[in-house]
């Protein structure tokens, strides 16, 4: 089963969208195998967004992610990375189609509510940044055969 990291960023937490957003992932059939509320340190945020370090928006990205609590989710399911990215929508909420998280709840590029890993390799690296191995719990839900088939 594939795993991916999802962050419900500080704007999602402040807007009290946690329950609504988590429900969208669960209703799609993804399984939560890890979940916690974190106030990201500057060090964690910089490691997480290291690929953007040379970009001009890097400082504001770090300031945003460290500016309030974030919900870190480890989700599991078939093609979890692609499924999450489709549910999230485009980075720019104003251009994201209705029916996606960003299309329904965001009009910003930076304050776009969620982060999702963009590849399986990055998902593994990001999950290791945000979760200890013993914080990820594998289990088979009673609806497994109905959702996965």
Indicate where each model-derived feature is located.
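Non-catalytic terminal and connector segments of soluble metabolic enzymes
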Residues: 1-149
């Amino acid at each position: 089963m594939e795993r991916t990291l999802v962050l419900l960023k500080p704007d999602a937490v402040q807007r009290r969208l946690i329950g609504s957003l988590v429900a969208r992932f669960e209703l799609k059939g993804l399984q939560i195998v890890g979940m916690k509320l974190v106030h990201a340190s500057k060090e964690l945020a910089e490691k997480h967004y290291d690929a953007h370090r040379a970009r001009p928006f890097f400082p504001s990205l770090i300031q945003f992610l460290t500016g309030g609590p974030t919900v870190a989710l480890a989700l599991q399911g078939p093609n979890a990375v692609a499924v999450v990215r489709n549910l999230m929508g485009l980075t720019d909420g104003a251009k994201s189609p209705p029916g996606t998280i960003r299309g329904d709840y965001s009009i910003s590029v930076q304050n776009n509510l969620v982060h999702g890993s963009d590849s399986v390799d990055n998902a593994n690296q990001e999950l290791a940044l945000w979760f200890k191995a013993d914080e990820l719990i594998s289990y088979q839900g009673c609806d497994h055969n109905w959702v996965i088939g």
